Amino acid sequence: MFDIGVGELTLIAVVALVVLGPERLPKAARFAGLWVRRARMQWDSVKQELERELEAEELKRSLQDVQASLREAEDQLRNKQQQVEQGARALHDDVSRDIDIRASATPVATPLELAHADWSASPDVDTAAGATDAAGAAHTAPVIAQAQPIAPAPHQTLVPAPHDAIVPAPHAAHLASAPEPVAVVPVDAGTPAASMPSAPAKIQEKQP
């Protein structure tokens, strides 16, 4: 504390012993020790206070550094905010200018022109609506199968066979020598062959 060595302490003790004597030396030693102890305590307290003050100063310095960095960051944020606001204002001005230019370039239709356009467009709308309705009706109408009428068969003209002449018996030899008459009957394509009577059969039936 006081930078006193061992030799110096020995010298002080010898001087005190000579000056004070052996009777007063113990009291003087206790008194000196008490004052030395108080001086150390006082020095320790001062030292602690100095250390506390130094720590406080360091804390203050660190706090000031932090505050300075925060201020710098705040200034940077403000600058960026101002730049963003300026860019937004410039963009808004450009957009509003373009809108004004387009609005001035686009002709404004008068009410008479609008009415004329609506009147000219109404027949087209009606025609389109009629075509749409017709197409819908064609799609929804049911398909009805109609039977075709059957044409009647052509009437067949029946020609009666000629009356066979009844010849008496005495003239049988003359009939035998004479050629037999052949009855010509018109034959229709649709008449079956079984329905046509033959002339010889009728002659034989009518002979007695």
From Swiss-Prot:
Keywords for the protein's UniProt record, in alphabetical order: Cell inner membrane, Cell membrane, Membrane, Protein transport, Translocation, Transmembrane, Transmembrane helix, Transport
Chain segments carrying region Disordered: 188-208
Superkingdom to which the source organism belongs: Bacteria
Subcellular location: Cell inner membrane
One term of GO molecular function: protein transmembrane transporter activity
GO CC list: TAT protein transport complex
GO BP terms in the entry: protein transport by the Tat complex
Keyword Iron-sulfur included in the entry's annotation: no
Record's bilayer topology term: Single-pass membrane protein
Record Pfam families: TatA_B_E
Keyword Magnesium: no
TM region(s), chain numbering: 1-21
Chief location category: membrane
Function: Part of the twin-arginine translocation (Tat) system that transports large folded proteins containing a characteristic twin-arginine motif in their signal peptide across membranes. Together with TatC, TatB is part of a receptor directly interacting with Tat signal peptides. TatB may form an oligomeric binding site that transiently accommodates folded Tat precursor proteins before their translocation.
Family: Belongs to the TatB family.
Assembly and oligomerization: The Tat system comprises two distinct complexes: a TatABC complex, containing multiple copies of TatA, TatB and TatC subunits, and a separate TatA complex, containing only TatA subunits. Substrates initially bind to the TatABC complex, which probably triggers association of the separate TatA complex to form the active translocon.
Designated name of the protein: Sec-independent protein translocase protein TatB
Origin species: Xanthomonas axonopodis pv. citri (strain 306)
Lineage of origin: Bacteria, Pseudomonadati, Pseudomonadota, Gammaproteobacteria, Lysobacterales
Protein's gene: tatB
